[in-house]
């Protein structure tokens, strides 16, 4: 490994090129370097090809056979961006609530189909929760097992109609996905029988 020796560091903002033990060449701007663990963080052009995005890659220098500094940054790096702590706390709280909701559904014995439907609804309408095996949406609509359109109950109105449309679309999408997977499996089976 041609990594820095004792007392040597990668400067934030420098551009480096690394060759991994798998022969993969990685090139990018140094975002961070932790000397004790020999972990290097690079910001690289996006693998999606989108110009306004970047990939951030963590590299363990123990698994790198070569490191070349392309352009060493000599000036002081720009100050770190400030963090919106309340926004981060809200996101962490929301993620925790989502995970607890998933865990509740699993422990309550809710079917995979019910869990998937809950996730689909939750993407659009955050105000949904579990009540035993029932999905409660906006405290107005109850969806009971087996979670089909006809299992949506509530007072007639736009909320019930909207939820029924989401449920209907969810199962339509699931069915079209299954059909596509079956046709791909049949094509693969057909291709393998032709090659034998």
UniProtKB/Swiss-Prot annotation:
Residues 3-73 form the Sm domain. Residues 174-196 are annotated as: Disordered. Belongs to the LSM12 family. Pfam families: AD (PF09793), LSM12_LSM (PF21166). Residues 177-196 have a biased composition (Polar residues). InterPro entries: AD (IPR047574), Lsm12-like (IPR039683), LSM12_ABD (IPR019181), LSM12_LSM (IPR048478), Sm (IPR047575). This is Protein LSM12 homolog A. GO terms for molecular function: RNA binding. PANTHER family: LSM12 HOMOLOG. Residues 81-175 form the AD domain. It comes from the Eukaryota.
């Amino acid at each position: 490994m041609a990594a820095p020796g004792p007392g040597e560091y990668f400067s934030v903002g420098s551009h480096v090129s690394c060759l991994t033990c798998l022969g993969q060449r990685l090139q990018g701007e140094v975002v961070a370097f932790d000397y004790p663990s020999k972990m290097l963080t690079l910001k690289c052009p996006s693998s999606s090809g989108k110009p306004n995005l970047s990939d951030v890659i963590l590299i363990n220098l123990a698994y790198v056979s070569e490191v070349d500094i392309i352009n060493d940054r000599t000036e002081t790096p720009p100050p770190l961006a400030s963090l919106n702590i309340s926004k981060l706390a809200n996101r962490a709280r929301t993620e925790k609530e989502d995970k607890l909701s998933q865990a509740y559904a699993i422990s309550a014995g809710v079917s995979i189909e019910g869990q998937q439907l809950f996730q689909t609804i939750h993407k659009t309408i955050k105000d949904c929760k579990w009540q035993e095996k029932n999905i409660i949406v906006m405290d107005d609509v109850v969806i009971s097992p087996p979670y089909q359109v006809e299992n949506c109950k509530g007072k007639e109105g736009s909320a019930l109609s909207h939820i029924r449309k989401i449920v209907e679309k969810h199962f339509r999408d699931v069915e079209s996905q299954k059909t596509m997977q079956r046709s791909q499996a049949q094509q693969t089976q057909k291709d393998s029988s032709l090659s034998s």
